Regions:
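Glycine- and Gly-Pro-enriched alpha-helical subdomains that act as flexible
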Residues: 145, 150-177, 182
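Short, flexible micro-motifs
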Residues: 162, 186, 224
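Feature captures the catalytic cores and cofactor-binding loops of soluble hydro-lyases/lyases
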Residues: 183-190
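Conserved alpha/beta cores of soluble small-molecule-handling proteins
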Residues: 1-144, 150-154, 191-232
């Protein structure tokens, strides 16, 4: 991001370093050291600083770190050699309408398995939602709401963002599940809501039946930032 006074800043790179380390452990990949990750962020941003969108544009420089196996392995087993790479690109609003409220449908497809890899930032989790998001767009929806795969009664997340709900008494509620990706944006928003805005916050199981009783709903994530939901 570019700040009002012209500085270039990154959003919580330390927590992103911790999350990629956790994901590596879950996928049997050697952990990317935090110092290496943070150095890469600084070098990539510095090399592409001319592409950081100006303050007030609503756009950002999106940074994508990734790790993948590179040696030839036929069997179902971890690779022996991996590469850690990082690239960046300027991006505008995640949804085409910008801050315009989006429309979401409840999906009949599962994004992740119970006690599986849903809490790991792995490419396979996004692959699981590709056909479903294309189908949603073809039917006039912006995103899918995924329910828990075990009982299909509780709200989890979308294919690329976490949910935030606000009750009629002003409490900020976010779903809790072991198959939801731990969102750094969501975590930060909950701290801001509680510590700086004085709001009551709850991270708990959210049943789909109670969604109709919330006063507000939104999505949050690295790309989505904060996107209002107008209809489910």
């Amino acid at each position: 991001y570019t700040t009002k006074d012209g500085r270039t800043v990154c959003f919580r790179p330390d927590l992103n370093a911790s999350r990629i380390a956790d994901s590596c452990r879950g996928l049997q990949i050697p952990v990317v050291p935090e110092e290496m990750f943070l150095r890469a962020v600084k070098e990539v941003v510095k090399a592409n600083e001319a592409w950081v969108p100006p303050f007030g544009s609503g756009a950002t420089l999106y940074i994508r770190p990734y790790v993948f196996g590179v040696n030839p392995v036929i069997g179902v087993k971890p690779a022996d050699e991996y590469e850690f790479r990082m690239f960046c690109t300027p991006v505008g609003p995640y949804f085409k309408g910008g801050a315009k409220p989006i429309t979401i449908r409840v999906s009949d497809v599962d994004r992740a398995a119970p006690h599986g890899t849903g809490n790991i930032k792995a490419g396979l989790n996004y692959a699981m939602s590709l056909h479903n998001i294309v189908d949603a767009h073809e039917h006039g929806f912006d995103e899918n709401m995924y329910l828990d795969p075990a009982t299909r009664t509780k709200v989890e997340e979308t294919g690329g963002a976490n949910f935030l709900f606000v009750t009629k008494d002003g409490t900020v509620v976010t779903p809790k599940s072991d198959s939801i990706l731990p969102s750094i944006t969501r975590r930060s928003l909950m701290v801001v809501a509680e510590k700086y805005l004085g709001l009551k916050v709850e991270q708990r199981e959210v049943y789909f039946d109670e969604v109709k009783d919330f006063a507000e709903c939104g999505l949050c994530g690295t790309a989505a930032v904060i996107s209002p939901v107008g209809k489910i």
